[in-house]
UniProtKB/Swiss-Prot annotation:
Lineage: Bacteria, Pseudomonadati, Pseudomonadota, Alphaproteobacteria, Hyphomicrobiales
Classification via Gene3D superfamilies: 3.30.70.240, Elongation factor 4, C-terminal domain, Elongation Factor G (Translational Gtpase), domain 3, P-loop containing nucleotide triphosphate hydrolases, Translation factors
EC identifiers of the protein: 3.6.5.n1
Keyword Hydrolase applies: yes
Record-linked SUPFAM superfamilies: EF-G C-terminal domain-like, P-loop containing nucleoside triphosphate hydrolases
Domain called tr-type G: residue spans: 7-189
Keywords: Cell inner membrane, Cell membrane, GTP-binding, Hydrolase, Membrane, Nucleotide-binding, Protein biosynthesis
Protein name from the UniProt record: Elongation factor 4
Gene transcribed to yield this protein: lepA
GO cellular component, one term: plasma membrane
Protein family: Belongs to the TRAFAC class translation factor GTPase superfamily. Classic translation factor GTPase family. LepA subfamily.
Amino acid sequence: MTTVPISNIRNFSIVAHIDHGKSTLADRLIQTTGGLQAREMKEQVLDSMDIERERGITIKAQTVRLNYHAQDGRDYIFNLMDTPGHVDFAYEVSRSLAACEGSLLVVDASQGVEAQTLANVYHALDAGHEIVPVLNKVDLPAAEPEQVRQQIEDVIGIDASEAVMISAKTGLGIDLVLEAIVHRLPPPQGDREAPLKALLVDSWYDVYLGVVVLVRVVDGVMKKGQRIRMMGTNAAYDLERVGFFTPKMTQVDELGPGEIGFITAGIKEVADTRVGDTITDDKKPVTEMLPGFKPAVPVVFCGLFPVDADDFETLRAAMGKLRLNDASFSFEMETSAALGFGFRCGFLGLLHLEIIQERLSREFDLNLIATAPSVIYKMHLTDGTELEIHNPIDMPDVVKIAEIQEPWIEATILTPDEYLGSVLKLCQDRRGTQKELTYVGSRAMVKYNLPLNEVVFDFYDRLKSVSKGYASFDYHLTDYQPADLVKMQILVNAEPVDALSMLVHRTRAEGRGRAMVEKMKELIPPHMFVIPIQAAIGGKIIARETVRALRKDVTAKCYGGDITRKRKLLEKQKEGKKKMRQFGKVDIPQEAFIAALKVDS
């Protein structure tokens, strides 16, 4: 393969809100430049996971290399990175952007700028990208390209007068996009003669090849057989394969500066390849590392337990496998009296949690129960020490706590005008404080400060339902603030059920507790004795429901005769019930757990 001069390489990514057509545009670019034959084309070529295709979202960032013969007669190489649009996977976005010099900003001409569009554009601007706006779906009857163009200028503040008008589905205007990439995006900078310096963009596990590493070469050349060193982990490997994706894996002899491709080097664990690390030559290393990116910090925690206790080892193996491909997912073992053995897992957000849960049940055929999601709280103790806890069970004695702090976020919500009232009410109910409210055409953009604790439960679902699905939402963590939080426990027959204990705000405890005990009452079947179900804060019971006992008619065999005979039998039954209540064990069905955890706050 002839080497293309570095000035003819373009590295770019596609950023957009969920569902604005990034992956479809990527399909068209691949098709137009001949990356795949027509029979190999399927919709969303780059969304390789089943879940991605089903939900129509992109989870893992994907990359592909295209050859393009431009109108000026030159041959260009495009490296396209398709990135996720959802807020939980912003981490995947930031690392794709670090490997590129430019971005195509795709905006749906019928929907306009959404919250995620903003977040991702700011990521791209932070990475120093040149941005080309692209208006997609202009063939829809509801499309308003002129208004959306104005909106891009007003909200994001970039010049959209030369925005490219396309319809990715029908292929309209794709050639204009390709020319815009050539003329409006900058080529990468790099020195072929300098020592090797490459950025580790991503890594995943392949059953045959071991760990496959996605790299962006900055300076120097990567060749087969070369010995490389990872500067962060200080491990050295011999390169076995070097190549790129067209989206199929294609091997080459070397990757030069500005190119994006993959390498394999007999690496066993994905954990050995830190995303954002710098790769260099073992013999001629560079002295300073490339600026990496911040490692992803889990924000939401929850316990995952197998419904069938025998599945525990399968679950452990499955989690290990997912961890191979998803560096932002973390877990540790935990045991619960009610649910047995399981894992405490950390996620980037609720969608991430849902996806992992779904992948576990799908790819590994596991039945799981998830406990209530919680966030990291900081406890300042009276003896001056500070604790971080994400499991309510670990909470120290109340007497020892001087102050509890909880994480807050800044949420940006874009919503059509007519739903603004209900959106504001929802945020108000969740202890939010409004920061600003601006109008962009007929849409309102609200910024709210909210406690993360209130958001992880079901905020996103509620937001979608009060706005009929039109509002979009994006958030980032700001800081920790003191909060009046209490630990609420659910007692069944005077025994605390550890899987249901949670930290709630004092003002919300009673409502939450009442809802949970009512739900439990419906779902716990009657036993031979009375079962009280209580919600308690410390020693104070805040809500109670009772499951009535089943009773056998012991006086059925008495015909007439003396009343004392009946009384004797009834007293005897009463004694037995009392004893039973003391020693009897209550079986809580799995549905009761699941329902209690789903109780709407």
